[in-house]
Amino acid sequence: MADKVGECGLSPCYSGKLLGTDHLDLYLLHWRDGITDLSGVVTAFESLHAAGKIRAWGVSNFNVSDMEDLFRIPHGDRCATNQVLYNVASRGIEHDLLPWCEQRGMPVMAYTPLGGASLLRDPALARIGAAHGCSAAAVALAWAIRSGNVIAIPESGSAAHVKENAVALSLTLTPQDLQALDAVHPPPHH
């Protein structure tokens, strides 16, 4: 189970009670907004980890500058992931954040990897899906996780969608597939 630290502060015990568990697998600081003392956050996360309340901790929506600040702090490099918006139509992190995380061996967690209903109606995704015998959603997810350093967390409303999405794990997009998607949804320019 995962949960995010919001405006109410670090409270995995409260979150655990709400979720019906005594520990969280991953606890995220959701936005840095106004937090100048990241060392206090890291110390709190490390204390929660040592107490067995959380198995890992990470951040959400941190840019490269925020990540550099975090990694300058003792134990800041124990951050398990950075959860950010990433999908075939929202590729801004490819410019700097994705390479930064890859260089440090830290996976990126992509939220909204399916990009919403309009992206799932994208003709390029549909064509590629038809060629591979799968859904546009499976293509979008396979695209998101193609580097091996991205974890996609799609929302799913049914068991059927979960099964459909799982196809992405065994789907290998061809260079032509990737070129077709780049033509419609170009990567950011450096």
Predicted regions and their residues:
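CE4/NodB-like, metal-dependent polysaccharide N-deacetylase domain
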Residues: E7-L28, S47-A51, I73
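Short, acidic/polar
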Residues: K4-L19, G40, S65-D69, E94
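Active-site mouth loops of central-metabolism enzymes
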Residues: M1-G6, H30
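Beta/alpha (TIM)-barrel catalytic core signal, keyed to glycine-rich beta->alpha loops juxtaposed to Asp/Glu
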Residues: R32-H190
